[in-house]
Curated annotation (Swiss-Prot):
Keywords: Amino-acid biosynthesis, Aminotransferase, Histidine biosynthesis, Pyridoxal phosphate, Transferase. This is Histidinol-phosphate aminotransferase. HAMAP family: HisC_aminotrans_2. PROSITE patterns: AA_TRANSFER_CLASS_2. Homodimer. Its cofactor is pyridoxal 5'-phosphate. Pfam families: Aminotran_1_2 (PF00155). GO terms for biological process: L-histidine biosynthetic process. It comes from Buchnera aphidicola subsp. Acyrthosiphon pisum (strain APS). Its EC number is 2.6.1.9. It catalyses: L-histidinol phosphate + 2-oxoglutarate = 3-(imidazol-4-yl)-2-oxopropyl phosphate + L-glutamate.
C-alpha cells in the first residue's frame, strides 16, 4: 500500500534530496553548536496578553511599519514572511513558469535557491563563483541569461563569508533590466551593513532584497523575514503568500526587537561577533591542522583543514558541532564555523591544538 502511495508523488520530488538543516543533521547532539550561524546568545521577551482565537493580519501593519522605519523604506515596499526562506519560495512561485523559465544560482552558496526551484519544476542554471576569490563569474552569467527570471545572490555569501563587489551587482542589475529580477539575500548584512543594496531599490525596479531576524537579531526560533522591493513586486508576491503567514506571538516579538533599544543591543552583539571573528581567524591561522582560513564578513568563518574528516569527527565527539562543507562546489576539505561566545571559541581552539599535537605527525601530513 505504501508503495502505491509513493507512486503518486511527483517525479522531481522522488529524486529530491531535502535541505540538510543544522537540526536535521546535528539534532540535539553537542553542547557547543557552531553549525547554523545562529546567535550564541538569546534574548527574551514577555508576550503581551492577547486573544488567540482570531486569525492575525496577513501583513501585520505595526510590524511592517517598524521594519520600514528600520530599513528607511516605504511600507508598500515590504512583505513580511516566515524567514527569508519563504521569500525565496514566493519569488519562484510568482515569477517562474515551470518547464519554461529558469533561475541562476552561484555555488558554493545557500542551497535553498536550488531546492525551491527543483520543487517548483523550474530549470536551474548553475554558474559557480570563481574559485578561491568566490566572486561572481559575470561573463558566464551574461552568456546564460536566456529564459532566466531570477538570479539569486547571497551577500555576504553563505558559506564562504565574502562580500561580492558592488560594481558587479550593479552590472548584473543593468544587464537584466526588463528581463530578470536580481535577488540579493542579505540574511547576514547586519555584520557588514555598509554593503547593503537597499539604497539601490529606488534606482532598479528589478532589484529584490531578502532580510531576516534570524541572525543578528538572535531570533532564529520565531521564523520572521522580509522581502524588500518595488511596490509592484510586493503586490505580486502578496497574491501567492499564504493568508496568515505571521502569527500574533511572532509579530509581537519582532516588533519589540525593532524598537530603538533592542536595535542598539543587536548592534552591540554584532560588534562582539565581529571582534570574536577577527580573534578566531588569527587563532586558527596558527593551528597546524589548518590549511587556509578564508576572510569573512559575516558571523561564520570557512576553514580548509588537513585531515578534515578526522577533525570534524573528533570535535563532534567532544560536543563541538560544526558544518561540513566538503561536498559543496569547490569546497573540498572545508568546514564552516559559526561564531559562538568567546568561551566557546576558546574551547574550539583548545581542542584543535590538542588534535594537531596528537595527529599532525610527519606521516599524516601527506593528506595536505
Amino acid at each position: 500500500m505504501t508503495d502505491n502511495v509513493l507512486k503518486l508523488s511527483r517525479k522531481n520530488i522522488k529524486k529530491l534530496i531535502p535541505y540538510q538543516s543544522a537540526r536535521r543533521i546535528g539534532g540535539e547532539h553537542g553542547n557547543i553548536l557552531l553549525n547554523a550561524n545562529e546567535s550564541p546568545v538569546s534574548i527574551f521577551f514577555k508576550l503581551k496578553k492577547k486573544p488567540f482565537n482570531r486569525y492575525p493580519e496577513c501583513q501585520p501593519s505595526k510590524l511592517i511599519s517598524s521594519y520600514a522605519h528600520y530599513v528607511n523604506l516605504s511600507c508598500n515596499q515590504i512583505l513580511a514572511t516566515r524567514g527569508a526562506d519563504e521569500g525565496i519560495e514566493l519569488l519562484i512561485k510568482a515569477f517562474c513558469e515551470p518547464g519554461k523559465d529558469a533561475i541562476i544560482y552561484c555555488p558554493p552558496t545557500y542551497d535553498m535557491y536550488r531546492i525551491n526551484a527543483t520543487i517548483a519544476g523550474v530549470e536551474i542554471k548553475e554558474i559557480p563563483t570563481i574559485k578561491n576569490t568566490w566572486q561572481l563569474d559575470l561573463l558566464n552569467i551574461k552568456l546564460n541569461l536566456s529564459r532566466v527570471k531570477l538570479i539569486y545572490i547571497c551577500n555576504p555569501n553563505n558559506p564562504t563569508g565574502n562580500i561580492f563587489f558592488k560594481k558587479d551587482l550593479i552590472f548584473l542589475l543593468n544587464i537584466t533590466l526588463g528581463q530578470a529580477l536580481v535577488v540579493i539575500d542579505e540574511a547576514y548584512i547586519e555584520f557588514s551593513p555598509e554593503e547593503s543594496m537597499t539604497n539601490y531599490l529606488k534606482d532598479y525596479p528589478n532589484l529584490v532584497v531578502l532580510r531576516t531576524l534570524s541572525k543578528a537579531f538572535a531570533l532564529a526560533g520565531i521564523r520572521c523575514g522580509f522581502t524588500l522591493a518595488k511596490k509592484e513586486i510586493i503586490q505580486t508576491l502578496s497574491k501567492v503568500i499564504s493568508p496568515y503567514p505571521i502569527s500574533i506571538p511572532v509579530s509581537d516579538i519582532a516588533i519589540r526587537s525593532l524598537e530603538k533599544d533592542y536595535v542598539q543591543l543587536m548592534k552591540n552583539r554584532v560588534l562582539d561577533s565581529n571582534n570574536n571573528r577577527i580573534w578566531l581567524i588569527n587563532q586558527l591561522k596558527n593551528i597546524t591542522c589548518v590549511e587556509t582560513v578564508f576572510e569573512s564578513n559575516a558571523n561564520y568563518v570557512l576553514v580548509k583543514f588537513s585531515m578534515f574528516e578526522k577533525v570534524f569527527e573528533t570535535l563532534w565527539n567532544k560536543g563541538i558541532i560544526l558544518r561540513n562543507q566538503n561536498e559543496k562546489t569547490n569546497l573540498k576539505k572545508c568546514i564552516r564555523i559559526s561564531m559562538g561566545t568567546r568561551s566557546e571559541s576558546l574551547r574550539l581552539i583548545k581542542e584543535l591544538k590538542i588534535f594537531s599535537k596528537k595527529n599532525m605527525c610527519q606521516g599524516e601530513m601527506s593528506e595536505k
